[in-house]
Amino acid sequence: AYRRIWLSGGMAAAIALLLILWSPWNKSDSTAPDIKIFAALNVPEQVTTQEKNGRIIVSTPPTTIINLTLEDGTHVLLSANSRLEYPKEFTLQNKRIVNLTGEARFEVAKDSLRPFIVSTGDIQTQVLGTVFDVNAYPCNTPTVTLYRGRVQVAKTDSSHRKEISPGQSATLETNGDIVVSKATQTEKEGWTDNEFYFDNTKMMQVLQSLGTWYNISVICHSPNLLQKRIHFRFNRNVSVESLLDALNDLGIAHFQYKNEEIMVY
């Protein structure tokens, strides 16, 4: 069963916090190729639930977060544009396996005899009972962030695992290495509080987050902007136009919504 998280529209203006750390944006480099940061996905317009061969598949549309409770008592907060597949009943004697595309927070019910495994295709996260996030959108680098307990992270095709502690993130790099680093807790927790919260975050990651939340293609016309870092906090329950107006107030770049795409100059 799931419970929709309703986002309060009245909060948007009240909690906006914009910090400006840069001089006005650089002029667009007309010689550099455009970079497509995110391509809109084929996702449902509302929450969908399917049952097939004893497995349940839940998919979320843009700008929607839902709560799920699995058969073993595990609680899942499933983010927008995400898909979770799990068994109706955990019948295996030695493990509990779910499959995730997108982003979710798991609060895993303890079961010392059956580890809980989240598989994203690229990485597997194994736990006994804990609280953690998995971000595995197609456009993003797969990342696991731990809040409580212990988890082990491994590439899907590897037996070598890395264990992370609370306050750490494990990221699968393009070369196949799993890199462990200190997590920015507030930034990682922002989406569960219905906020965009970026703390010294690279523009590339910011644009990926906007694309995945609204399911809108994002194109950067000035690649040198992608390494800029941004401090930004804003409620998620606003139109894309309102959000881009707030980002434009930072003075770091020009954001425009045109032809169902976000353009960045």
Model-identified regions with their sequence ranges:
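A residue-level detector for the "anchor" residue at the start of short, highly conserved motifs
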Residues: 4, 8-11, 19-265
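Hydrophobic beta-strand segment of the Class I
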Residues: 14
